Design a protein with these regions (language model features):
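Amphipathic alpha-helical segments enriched in hydrophobic/aromatic and basic residues
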Residues: 24, 33-34, 45, 55, ...
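Short coil/turn segments at alpha/beta junctions that flank glycine-rich nucleotide-binding fingerprints
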Residues: 26-30, 81, 103, 151
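Amphipathic alpha-helical segments used for helix-helix packing
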Residues: 88, 102-128
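Basic, helix-initiating cap at the start of DNA-binding domains
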Residues: 1-27, 31-43, 57-60
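Short, intrinsically disordered, charge-balanced linker/junction segments flanking boundaries
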Residues: 1, 6, 147-155
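Hydrophobic alpha-helical connector segments
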Residues: 61, 75-108
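Amphipathic alpha-helical packing segments from all-alpha helical-bundle domains
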Residues: 68-71, 75, 83, 87-91, ...
Length: 155
């Protein structure tokens, strides 16, 4: 058995995620098998299982990788004091949209999440995660709109 360095393991993991992202975008999540991903990444299915417990975990890791820049952008905005809640809401939306527009990976993963994911049992954790993310985003928007109303900026 060949021992791999941390860098080689990280590169293998990234190539698996890259292959999954491309195939999910092309074929949809439910029609893409782990064997398809392994072949496209030039690895064995065993290598996939070394990094990811199942297809759902692989899907979640792909989502995490693409949403990290968005989460970081919103977190930076959270560190600033809120002067105008409507401007904060606009800034958050613009930060996320700017990443989707300029980052091909984020754009492709957003497309996969919204158009190419059939929520089956194998990616049920992704369905739950998506629902939680939507609820969190809605909560943020509601809080900012409520603050704007209380300040008289909105009727």
């Amino acid at each position: 058995m060949v021992r791999r360095t941390k860098e080689e393991a990280a590169a293998t993991r990234d190539s698996i995620l890259d292959a999954a992202e491309i195939l999910f975008a092309k074929q949809g999540v439910s029609r893409t098998t782990l064997q398809h991903i392994a072949s496209a990444a030039g690895v064995t299915r065993g290598a996939i299982y070394w990094h990811f417990v199942d297809k759902g975990a692989l899907y979640s890791a792909m989502m995490d990788r693409a949403t990290m820049p968005m989460d970081a952008a919103v977190k930076l905005l959270d560190e600033r004091p809120v002067v105008d809640p409507l401007q904060r809401l606009r800034d958050e939306m613009m930060a996320v949209l700017q990443i989707v527009v300029t980052d091909a990976t984020a754009r492709r993963v957003f497309e996969i999440a919204t158009l190419k994911t059939e929520f089956t049992d194998e990616v049920d954790s992704a369905r739950i995660r998506k629902r939680e993310a939507v609820c969190e985003w809605r909560g943020r928007m509601e809080a900012q709109l409520a603050q704007a109303q209380s300040e008289g900026t909105l009727p």
